[in-house]
């Protein structure tokens, strides 16, 4: 385990937020490494627990984690599931009305979201780039490494 100091907090969140009694396989090592700011390429089968390897570190670190996902349905499912658990997650994609998108942007600027899911093509839009640029400056910290789901 690379970062044992992070693991007790991670294990507590794993149990209290996600409802899992223990990590599976290499999850503990990956979560500790990512929570400490490290990069990871995680290859696991469907249902193997990949999402937890970035969702949990997002809750351990300050700022907002950016999750890049090409599948709108996956974004919607993950954000809905995280919200059910009390996690401050949001998405920005073409399914939102202009008013809904503005509300997500406002919440991001106020530091009220832990995870933001976006489609890759949204990262090419000037409005999104301006939003992200504004989040990088203090007081809101947008974590530097996006996650691709």
Please name every model-derived segment:
Residues 2-7, 32, 84, 113, ...:
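ASCE RecA-like P-loop NTPase motor cores
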Residues 37-56, 66-69:
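Walker A/P-loop
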Residues 31, 55, 102-105, 129:
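Short hydrophobic/charged patches on amphipathic alpha-helices used for structural packing
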């Amino acid at each position: 385990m690379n970062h044992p100091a992070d693991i007790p907090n991670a294990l507590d969140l794993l149990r209290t937020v996600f409802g899992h009694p223990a990590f599976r396989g290499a999850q503990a090592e990956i979560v500790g490494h990512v929570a400490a700011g490290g990069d990871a390429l995680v290859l696991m089968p469907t249902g193997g627990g990949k999402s937890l390897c970035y969702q949990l570190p997002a809750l351990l670190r300050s700022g907002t984690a950016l999750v890049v996902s090409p599948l709108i349905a996956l974004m919607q499912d993950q954000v809905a599931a995280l919200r059910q658990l009390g996690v401050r997650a949001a998405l920005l994609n073409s399914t939102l009305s202009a008013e809904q998108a503005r509300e997500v942007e406002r919440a991001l600027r106020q530091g009220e979201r832990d995870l933001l899911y976006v489609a890759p093509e949204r990262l090419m839009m000037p409005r999104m780039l301006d939003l992200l640029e504004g989040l990088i400056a203090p007081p809101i910290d947008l974590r530097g490494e996006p996650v691709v789901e």
